[in-house]
Amino acid sequence: MSFVTTQPEALSSAATALGGIGLSFSAQNAAASAPTTGVVPAAADEVSALTAAQFAAHAQLYQVVAAQAAAIHEQFVNTLATSSGSYAATEAANAAAAG
């Protein structure tokens, strides 16, 4: 027989804290989007234009990857919160059954 020991309150607290971190991460990425994707060439020459375009392309790729990371993070937070509730309900049911 296997036993699982959890602390649903700790899981819930961790989910809340991680949710806040995710919101902060998303806000910072949104704030950085315009200045990093809209890089203006330093001069009117071809090299400056290509360099600015390269920086902008890199920033756009970063925004795509950051959006994927935010989605994975949100799924993790939701799973953690759901698991916390499930463990708490199971603990309550076991306590009621044990009397």
Regions of interest found by a model, annotated:
Residues 1-99:
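A glycine-centric feature that highlights glycine-enriched low-complexity/repetitive segments
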